[in-house]
Amino acid sequence: MTENNEHLALWGGRFTSGPSPELARLSKSTQFDWRLADDDIAGSRAHARALGRAGLLTADELQRMEDALDTLQRHVDDGSFAPIEDDEDEATALERGLIDIAGDELGGKLRAGRSRNDQIACLIRMWLRRHSRAIAGLLLDLVNALIEQSEKAGRTVMPGRTHMQHAQPVLLAHQLMAHAWPLIRDVQRLIDWDKRINASPYGSGALAGNTLGLDPEAVARELGFSRVTDNSIDGTAARDLVAEFAFVAAMTGVDISRLSEEIIIWNTQEFAFVKLDDGYSTGSSIMPQKKNPDIAELARGKSGRLIGDLTGLLSTLKGLPTAYARDLQEDKEAVFDQVDTLEVLLPAFTGMVKTMHFDGDRLEEEAPTGFALATDIAEWLVKNGVPFRHAHELSGACVKLAEGRGQELWDLTDNDFIETFAAFLPADKAPGVREVLSSHGSVDSRNGKGGTAYGRVREQIADAKAEVEELKLFPASTSDGSAYKAPGTF
């Protein structure tokens, strides 16, 4: 398109001069907010129709306005229209483009009844709602990859750890599902957050509302919102919902980082629990033997970045008075960075998880070591009438005895158990403790709800699958149940 490169500002009538070059450079935001252009054009269409319903645009003017906005959208899509150096923000750039197409008289009418304050507050909500659905879909892909690995793991037992020390044997599937559930909760948080952000600030004006008879409810419906914000000041200035999204993104990063840490450890030569697919690993520029878990390491590193975005945003918001202040321009880069990070990270991370190969023999071999069956001894003693305080001490005595000999618990003799338990159990009963001295026996005994017994793990996998089926509706719909429409399709 032929661009009008003449400087256009959305303010200035009471000023005797334009902004200084230094102020213009500081104020400029098109380098990051241009990504809101599609949402802005969609919002402008809805606003134009509101102006038409209010009698502020004739039917002919409304048609020409919509045609001009369609043309502007095409030019944005094909790259023939873009911001220029003088454009303060994406709203300024798009108004310049609209006036270039529709003319100054018609193009200049679109701003009636709309402030950049309510405009940008609505656009960031639209953008985040759309991308939250994309992120939710990517998270569910990762959950499904963990479920698939859990199903493949079957009855494989591994050493469960607390404080990074051997604790108790658990099913590998149980360990993997322990990472699936937090990710499911991250999706649930996005869905819950969407209920609150599903309100349009359009019609709030600068802060006090509008006097032109516009219909904010109609605009809200056209833009995929189920309602309008209840307070015009809150509508223009509230960024708690942006911060809430930033928290969910940061929490997602933390949940992924914790899984990354385990994968990195499991992938070491010392552990050798898992091998990563070549397609999801990297090498060294100098050491030919290296096969590095870069995706897991990058995920761990990027979690700090996601947390930093949240912290920076909260620091910006904490000192602001009520109503709009220019500081709020700083809300966007934080969440833009988070979305960009997650939308690149999650597909790579899911691919790594999906293609991991676990060494079942190695896991089974390590599962009962490190005196991991000591708790089973204590619980066996309790079942045989020994108070737990004493059972705990007796099990600890068995550990001390085995450790002193450089043995494992199952290496102790019947006489060892008879002598250790003599004050509480008859000699003929003490050797019966051997029935719990196997990792599979230990796992199978933990069959309460949420436990690591095979049947319970199968149960939780089924529950997770059902939850995913319900949650996957979110990426394809708005919170009010209607089909979510991408910008430009209203």
From Swiss-Prot:
GO MF assignments: argininosuccinate lyase activity
Domain of life assignment: Bacteria
Cellular localization per UniProt: Cytoplasm
GO BP terms: arginine biosynthetic process via ornithine; L-arginine biosynthetic process
Catalytic activity line of the entry: 2-(N(omega)-L-arginino)succinate = fumarate + L-arginine
Keyword list, A-Z: Amino-acid biosynthesis, Arginine biosynthesis, Cytoplasm, Lyase
Listed EC numbers: 4.3.2.1
Major place of residence: cytoplasm
Gene3D superfamilies from the UniProt entry: Fumarase/aspartase (C-terminal domain), Fumarase/aspartase (Central domain), Fumarase/aspartase (N-terminal domain)
GO CC annotations, alphabetized: cytosol
SUPFAM superfamilies assigned: L-aspartase-like
Pathway: Amino-acid biosynthesis; L-arginine biosynthesis; L-arginine from L-ornithine and carbamoyl phosphate: step 3/3
UniProt record similarity statement: Belongs to the lyase 1 family. Argininosuccinate lyase subfamily.
UniProt cross-references to PANTHER family, sorted A to Z: ARGININOSUCCINATE LYASE
Protein name: Argininosuccinate lyase
Originating organism: Bifidobacterium longum subsp. infantis (strain ATCC 15697 / DSM 20088 / JCM 1222 / NCTC 11817 / S12)
Organismal lineage: Bacteria, Bacillati, Actinomycetota, Actinomycetes, Bifidobacteriales
Gene label: argH
